[in-house]
Amino acid sequence: MARSAAREAAMQLIYEHMMGGSGEETLGGMIEFVPDRDDARYIETVTEGVFAALHDVDRYIVAFAQDWAIDRLARVDLAILRLAAYELLCMEDIPAAVTINEAVELARKYSTEQSGAFINGVLGNLNRKLEREKDESRSGL
């Protein structure tokens, strides 16, 4: 399984959980059938991380969704944003450009072209804020 496929599976689990499904139970069953241990570990880490940090992840999404309340976002777009925002916030080993590009590709596949542009904007703004904060902490400001 390629990392893109693992990311797609993680997004689907997050979406399932949001729609009232048992994402956690499905996760356990899915992990058994993922042949690559790194991909299985990624899926488990990111889905559990999103569930555990949901309030913080959503706070960042709302901050950069410019006049969009979280309950007005399309559910699939929100699942993609939650996955990608978590990666940007907590998984520094994944390049931000990869995270953002993969999120846009997921939006194009599962949502609309407009969603891809919206997700790109939200994540791009979030990433710029995080980069500024890193620069400030390095310079001691």
Tell what function each PLM region has.
Residues 1-141:
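N-terminal interaction/assembly modules
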